């Protein structure tokens, strides 16, 4: 088991996956802290955490292909290749009260994946040029609560799988969303698209959403734009 690790002030160049802390149920990791880390992984996966029960923290991290300018690898074809992979920049599952604060990503299929066996707080984020901004899954009605606030999502690229959506919420649990803005537009650094958002996840009235001006796909027949 990995315990008490801090990764701070790191910059990654040309990596495929930057930081992988996926444990197992019989071999967990705990007290993991990521802060002030930078990069642009070619898989689209910057931080992966699984089975980390003593409060993982991801703070002040920045993922942007501009980090690769030194090597001349910021052209649109590279970014489009990363977007085409069904991955998320930040992905967590099987955690207690995870803290995700001040996160940025650009040019990825997915921004943040919150697994079905997680809960916690996500605040102060910018997810730019993604297919899916946040995918919040829910594995039950007990203690599967996420509070999401103070963020901006630009979902405007054609990746794969779910289609273009600022937020997707599926399964059971509770999600509170406050002061999150979603919008779209072009960007010369990649191939951008801007279709209509649709709701395609089916009905489940055990998923609860509290929203304030946010476009979302919810696991129920709720309009995709909750405005």
Short names for language-model regions:
Residues 1-227:
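Extracellular/periplasmic carbohydrate-active domains that bind, remodel
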């Amino acid at each position: 088991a990995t315990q008490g690790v801090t990764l701070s002030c790191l910059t990654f160049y040309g990596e495929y996956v930057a930081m992988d802390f996926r444990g197992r149920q019989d071999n967990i990791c705990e007290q993991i802290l990521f802060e002030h880390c930078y990069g642009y992984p070619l898989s689209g996966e910057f931080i992966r955490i699984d089975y980390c029960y003593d409060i993982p923290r991801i703070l002040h991290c920045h993922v942007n292909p501009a980090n690769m300018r030194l090597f001349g690898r910021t052209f649109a074809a590279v970014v489009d290749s990363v977007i085409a992979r069904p991955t998320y920049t930040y992905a967590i599952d099987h955690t207690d009260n995870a803290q995700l604060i001040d996160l940025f990503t650009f040019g990825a299929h997915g921004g943040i994946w919150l697994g079905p066996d997680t809960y916690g707080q996500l605040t102060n984020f910018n997810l730019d040029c993604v297919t899916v901004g946040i995918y919040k899954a829910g594995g039950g009605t007990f203690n599967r609560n996420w509070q999401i606030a103070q963020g901006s999502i630009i979902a405007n690229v054609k990746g794969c799988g779910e289609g273009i959506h600022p937020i997707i919420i599926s399964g059971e649990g509770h999600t509170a969303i406050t002061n999150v803005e979603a919008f779209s537009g072009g960007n010369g650094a990649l191939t951008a698209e801007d279709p209509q958002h649709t709701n395609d996840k089916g009905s489940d009235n055990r998923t609860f959403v509290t929203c304030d001006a946010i476009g979302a796909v919810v696991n129920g027949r709720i309009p995709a734009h909750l405005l």
